[in-house]
Amino acid sequence: MRRKKKTIECIEYLSVSAPLDKVDRLEDKQSKYIHEYVKNKEYMIVGTERRHGFSQNDVDRQWHQIVDKIRKKQVDGVIVANMSVITDNLIDAFIKIAQVQDAGGIIVTV
């Protein structure tokens, strides 16, 4: 008898560094790339959070909202295509990873 894989429900976080007139198109491409990755994996995308070309402060605010959803067990984790686009530096990346792990979630980078 085959064992069923547990589905991990995640939010996809879309973030690109580009001129404002190209942001939506590039975020759509990033979403397609993430969906292609999770198609044959145990992850399921249950929500999407877009940066929309906002500043780093807005990214941090959105990140805290995602961490709160993980803490409340509404989702199991977050999927990002490129961690370097949502962080200022390496220390900020470690802090964001630690926040998600402390909340009991996972981060998947594609």
Annotated model-derived regions:
Residues 1-110:
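Short, structured surface patches at the beginning of a domain
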